[in-house]
Amino acid sequence: EKLGIQYHVVKTQIADILKAKIKEGSFCSLCAKMRKGALTDFAKKLGCNKIAYAHHKDDFIETMLLSLFYEGQFFTFPPTKYYKESDITVIRPLIYIPEKDIIGFQNKMSFQCVKNPCPHDGNTRREYVKNLLHQLKKDNPKIKEKMFNAILKGKIYEW
């Protein structure tokens, strides 16, 4: 608000729905799909045709590893994607920015961070992958950059 930027908080019943439908375990994937749907619906109500997500470089790499480890596929989200069914384009303008740089900027500007309301925050597969990368980085300080570049090149040689 102090920057003069209009924003909206979209209230949903996603947590209640997930608690009622899923008894045990993680429901991150379903929750993400439901949040995406809620944002898309709200964007359409506002007459928007683009949604900007704050996914950063670390999210990009972590998503690829999650897909590889838990789904058996080599996938991560693209920087931009058009969804024909909703006529919405998703953009990710921070995809080349490491999380640490965003946190540094946030601290420098004294921006308040919105706390993740997820009851599983800090105890998810994504958090496991984040910690794994942190450990791997101790032996290979450039591992995230190498993984990022490998994803961008998108080739498996001699396959």
Language model region names:
Residues 124, 138, 142-159:
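A short, charged, Gly/Pro-tolerant segment at domain boundaries
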Residues 23-25, 86-89, 144:
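A short, structure-level motif marking secondary-structure boundaries and short turns
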Residues 50, 58-138:
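Catalytic subdomain that performs nucleotidyl-dependent activation
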Residues 13-15, 96, 119, 153:
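Short, solvent-exposed coil/turn elements at secondary-structure transition points
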Residues 34-35, 81-86, 156-159:
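AMP-forming adenylation/ATP pyrophosphatase catalytic core
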Residues 1-64, 70-73, 100-108:
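ATP-dependent adenylation/nucleotidyltransferase module used to activate substrates
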Residues 38, 131-132, 146:
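Alpha-helical elements of Rossmann-like donor-binding domains used by nucleotide-donor carbohydrate transfer enzymes
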